[in-house]
């Protein structure tokens, strides 16, 4: 058997009709096929192909593997056929042909791989077995149909081929000699080539030479089949004179892989006729079968399907069957549930429970099995259902459907199921009327429930309902008020965090529209008025010191100026934004001088004294200084001055003084033991301005 390289197989696949026009084959390195249909155009490169199908010919299409597979299939088919029909093939002819072929070795066509040819549609054409006497025909002439007998024409196939083979002198060259040879071969090997239409398979076989002249090597062997024509496709069948009486048509074709292959066109008309006849016979058999009528449960009879009746053994000789007898036998074979039912009822009576009034067969569509998702059940698997007998009877539509299907024939199952599905879908008008009734029923039920709920309300629930309604109205009014406020702020652009920060920045900036002071904002004025109100508290209370809330630097300066005019001490503590001012009384403080007139006078004076001084080059923040027309003596400090020298005596209402008096202290007495009494004067703090000395 000759072997083919990958490149040779690629050359054959490229021009074969197996692949479509859009299929391209990528060659291996070393391929020198100059007849490539793709050319050297850059657009035909692999990278430019829209859709590429790469095929490795050795893996995809291997003629050697296919030939081995065909040989194995043929051997298995022959063995099975011989075992079934017990037909012994004549061994002499086979051995003789094999010996002849092995001795001569002149037919070199046997070394070439034979394979199934493939049409342009991708369908494989089956190969027909070639009769042994086919080689005896004249290869240069077409055999007439009338020259063959009728039986040989029906069993065998007319072979037409035109090969450019040079016939030898001893070959048969006339149709008369070929007819005689056909008759001889038909009588000797009639059993070998007779086939049934059902068991016929298309097989591949190498023709055996029966001609004595060729077998004895007396004549010159024919030239090798490789010199035959390249290909004869099935499209050229009309060129041959073919009689319509033949059952099958085969033609010899040539391919580049092998020298000879046989294409066969199967005629499936006989198979279709056989299928139709088989269906008709089945229908007639079903009509002849007895139709068993269904019995109602109310009459005490049993229903059973046709499948159950077919499983019974009937006497073939008797035409009429005793159905009553058969049904009684069938029922007698099944287990009775009477004892189980009595036991269950007795247990329920002992436990004083409701009686179970009925036992139903649990089919595949029962409620419990559907709930538990159980599959198929056994034949005698039952489930107990408990329901009130005063209600309507229990009719499960799913079980009714299964009974109908079981009672019907096999062919009518699908029709009944379709009929049930159609019945479920009501007409459009009926569906609308049903929905309308459902809506009315739902409204009526809701109205009855509402009336029952309203009648059951007592005084307490009514009071609770009134309270809840009142609270709901309050919440609603509160939300409406907040909504109005938010709408107002939104219209002014003051809603949100960004708007609030913007408003604060604008309030801190100096406003030219302020008639009182160009540098004081509304918040600053409110703070100063608050300071004035706190200072008036010194009139009516014994408070010596007060602390003011933290404020900005220039506001603290204004507070210090105000305290100086009122003869008060002022001092700031803390750092940063938390720096605040402390005010304390002096002996010069006159409470009567603190009035609205003095405050307005101070505010008018401060209006012209507050100025901003900025240092742009140094990058400092703006600094505000307050300049006064006159300076008070209270603000000046002298060297050697006693701190609090002019301070008034602590009043008797002071809680500290009252505590000391309870302990035995009085004015002019020193602190300490009477025998070792301390200084009678209070401790003093002397101011030192100069830096000389330690004291």
Curated annotation (Swiss-Prot):
Residues 652-695 form the G-patch domain. Pfam families: G-patch (PF01585), R3H (PF01424). Residues 421-434 have a biased composition (Basic residues). PROSITE patterns: G_PATCH, R3H. PANTHER family: G PATCH DOMAIN CONTAINING PROTEIN 2. It comes from Schizosaccharomyces pombe (strain 972 / ATCC 24843) (Fission yeast). InterPro entries: G_patch_dom, R3H_dom, R3H_dom_sf, Splicing_assoc_domain. GO terms for cellular component: cytoplasm; cytosol; nucleus. This is G-patch and R3H domain-containing protein C30B4.02c. GO terms for molecular function: nucleic acid binding. The lineage of its organism: Eukaryota, Fungi, Dikarya, Ascomycota, Taphrinomycotina. SUPFAM superfamilies: R3H domain. Residues 262-286, 307-317, 337-351 have a biased composition (Acidic residues). It comes from the Eukaryota. GO terms for biological process: rRNA processing. It is found in: Cytoplasm. Residues 525-587 form the R3H domain. Keywords: Cytoplasm. Residues 182-198 have a biased composition (Basic and acidic residues). Residues 168-200, 213-242, 257-317, 332-351, 388-448, 475-517 are annotated as: Disordered.
């Amino acid at each position: 058997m000759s072997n083919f390289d990958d490149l040779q197989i690629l050359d054959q696949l490229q021009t074969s009709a197996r692949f479509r026009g859009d299929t391209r084959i990528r060659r291996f390195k070393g391929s020198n096929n100059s007849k490539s249909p793709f050319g050297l155009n850059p657009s035909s490169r692999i990278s430019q192909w829209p859709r590429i199908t790469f095929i490795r010919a050795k893996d995809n299409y291997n003629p050697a593997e296919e030939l081995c597979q065909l040989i194995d299939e043929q051997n298995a088919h022959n063995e099975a056929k011989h075992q079934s029909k017990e037909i012994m093939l004549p061994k002499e002819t086979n051995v003789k042909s094999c010996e002849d072929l092995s001795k001569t070795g002149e037919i070199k066509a046997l070394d070439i791989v034979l394979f199934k040819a493939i049409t342009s549609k991708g369908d494989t054409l089956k190969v027909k077995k070639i009769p042994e006497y086919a080689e005896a025909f004249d290869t240069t002439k077409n055999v007439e149909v009338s020259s063959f007998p009728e039986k040989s024409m029906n069993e065998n196939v007319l072979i037409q081929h035109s090969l450019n083979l040079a016939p030898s002198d001893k070959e048969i060259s006339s149709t008369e000699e070929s007819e005689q040879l056909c008759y001889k071969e038909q009588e000797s090997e009639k059993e070998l080539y007779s086939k049934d239409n059902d068991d016929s398979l298309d097989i591949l076989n190498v023709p055996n030479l029966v001609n004595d002249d060729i077998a004895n090597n007396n004549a010159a062997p024919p030239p090798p089949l490789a010199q035959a024509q390249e290909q004869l496709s099935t499209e050229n069948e009309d060129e041959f004179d073919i009689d319509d009486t033949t059952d099958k048509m085969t033609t010899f074709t040539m391919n580049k892989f092998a020298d000879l292959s046989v294409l066969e066109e199967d005629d499936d008309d006989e198979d279709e006729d056989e299928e139709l006849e088989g269906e008709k016979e089945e229908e007639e058999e079903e009509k002849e079968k007895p139709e068993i009528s269904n019995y109602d449960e109310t009459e005490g009879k049993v229903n059973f399907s046709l499948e159950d009746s077919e499983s019974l053994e009937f006497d073939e000789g008797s035409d009429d069957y005793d159905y009553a007898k058969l049904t009684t036998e069938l029922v007698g074979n099944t287990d009775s549930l009477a004892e189980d039912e009595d036991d269950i009822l007795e247990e329920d009576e002992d436990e004083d429970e409701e009686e179970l009034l009925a036992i139903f067969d649990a089919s595949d569509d029962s409620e419990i099995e559907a709930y538990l998702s159980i599959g198929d059940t056994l034949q005698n698997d039952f489930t107990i259902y408990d329901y009130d007998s005063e209600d309507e009877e229990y009719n499960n539509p799913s079980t009714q459907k299964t009974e109908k299907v079981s009672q019907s024939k096999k062919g009518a199952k699908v029709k009944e199921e379709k009929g049930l599905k159609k019945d479920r879908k009501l007409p459009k008008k009926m569906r609308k009327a049903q929905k309308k009734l459902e809506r009315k029923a739902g409204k009526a039920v809701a109205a009855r429930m509402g009336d029952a709920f309203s009648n059951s309300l007592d005084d307490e629930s009514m009071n609770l309902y009134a309270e809840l309604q009142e609270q709901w109205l309050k919440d609603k009014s509160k939300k409406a008020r907040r909504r109005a406020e938010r709408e107002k702020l939104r219209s002014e652009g003051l809603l949100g965090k960004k708007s609030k920060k913007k408003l604060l920045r604008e309030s801190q900036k100096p406003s030219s529209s302020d008639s009182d002071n160009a540098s004081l904002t509304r918040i600053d004025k409110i703070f100063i008025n608050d300071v004035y109100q706190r200072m008036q508290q010194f009139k009516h209370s014994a408070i010596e010191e007060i602390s003011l809330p933290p404020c900005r630097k220039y506001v603290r300066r204004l507070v210090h100026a105000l305290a100086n005019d009122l003869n008060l001490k002022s001092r700031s503590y803390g750092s940063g934004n938390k720096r605040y001012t402390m005010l304390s009384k002096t002996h010069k403080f006159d409470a009567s001088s603190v009035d609205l007139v003095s405050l307005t006078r101070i505010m008018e004076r401060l209006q012209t004294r507050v100025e901003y001084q900025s240092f742009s080059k140094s990058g400092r923040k703006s600094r505000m200084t307050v300049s006064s027309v006159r300076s008070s003596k209270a603000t000046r400090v002298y060297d050697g001055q006693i701190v609090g020298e002019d301070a008034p005596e602590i009043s008797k209402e002071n809680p500290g003084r009252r505590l000391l008096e309870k302990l035995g202290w009085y004015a002019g007495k020193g602190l300490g033991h009477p025998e070792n009494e301390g200084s009678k004067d209070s401790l003093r703090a002397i101011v030192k301005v100069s830096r000389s000395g330690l004291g």
